[in-house]
Amino acid sequence: MVSARALLWAICVLRVALATVYFQEEFLDGERWRNRWVQSTNDSQFGHFRVSSGKFYGHKEKDKGLQTTQNSRFYAISASFKPFSNKGKTLVIQYTVKHEQKMDCGGGYIKVFPSDLDQKKMNGKSQYYIMFGPDICGFDIKKVHVILYFKNQYHENKKPIRCKVDGFTHLYTLILRPDLSYEVKVDGQSIESGSIEYDWNLTSLRKTEKTSLDSRDWDQVEGSKVQDWEKHFLDAGASKPSDWNSELDGDWLQKPPYEDGLKAEGIDKDVWLHQKMRPAGYLTQYDLSEFENIGAIGLELWQVRSGTIFDNFLITDDEEYAEKFGKATWGETKGPEKEMDAIQAKEEVKKAREEDEEDLLMGKFHRHNHFSRFHRQGEL
């Protein structure tokens, strides 16, 4: 008999097996990455990328990724894949980024584009669906961008989400669900979540109902004056007041007393139902969490100091698969990466001390020679 644990494990394996992976990139095949990634030539001054694991790493091959190489440059590179729509599905976007140069000002975010992106001409004005990831500049800007594109406008999450600012590799994950919830994870830990509607101020774009002031198809029957109309409005016993001024008060008319039970005749009494009106910015529920033609992922950013490494790109519809992929990549190398950095730091400290001691000894030697020369000169 199959145990409950074995059955549960089998279900988990099956679920991961059924996950749809739209894009996955680890740069494990040497220079073949150049066949998949397109460097934009829109500007001859765009910075260039190389594939490298950097100055320190957890695994020399597994930690290789796209690295920026030139200071004070804009960068633009992208990779395309088979277009898809995430309608009614979860969308997970994940990647790793390492600012080993200790970023002072520059972007570490990615962009997800529609399939009609002109990769050769990609630039800062190219339309994108999603912008996600860290952005650092000075002391003021240390945030995770989550920008979504709706109705020809870019909307940024109104919550401040802080990014990592050290020089190690970090795993960034964005999850958009069809129930209009979202979640942002850093290093596998949830740091922000909520409603797409409210955290992007999109409630005004949702479907609303307005009562119309008039209805074009309303068939109002025209009434006609009844034969004894005057008797309802003239009072034979009434007389004109003595102080009535026709020039100021107008013509005086006899007014009948109110008759209880007076009913209107010849009037359409059907119930009139208001129409449902759609405002100009009308969006259905799914419009707030779906993108019809996702077909490319890329880096379009500015950096003052280069050296950032981007790796382990993933776009899928399965949160569990993304979690397992993160553990199998970043999770396996994060520890050894820190160990290598610590070893290098100790070696640098040791080298600096040796250089200081050498400088000190050389300084004493020079001072001794100078004194000897001065003493000999005094004897002459």
UniProtKB/Swiss-Prot annotation:
Tissue: Testis specific, absent in mature sperm.
Keyword Glycoprotein belongs to the record: yes
Keywords linked to the UniProt accession: Chaperone, Differentiation, Disulfide bond, Endoplasmic reticulum, Glycoprotein, Repeat, Signal, Spermatogenesis
Sequence repeats: 191-202, 209-220, 222-231, 235-246, 250-256, 260-268, 270-280
Record region (N-domain): 20-197
Region (P-domain): 198-291
Position of the signal peptide: 1-19
GO CC annotation: endoplasmic reticulum lumen; nuclear envelope
Disruption phenotype: Defective sperm migration from the uterus into the oviduct and defective binding to the zona pellucida.
GO biological process: cell differentiation; spermatogenesis
Family: Belongs to the calreticulin family.
Function: CALR3 capacity for calcium-binding may be absent or much lower than that of CALR. During spermatogenesis, may act as a lectin-independent chaperone for specific client proteins such as ADAM3. Required for sperm fertility.
Identification of the protein by name: Calreticulin-3
Lineage: Eukaryota, Metazoa, Chordata, Craniata, Vertebrata
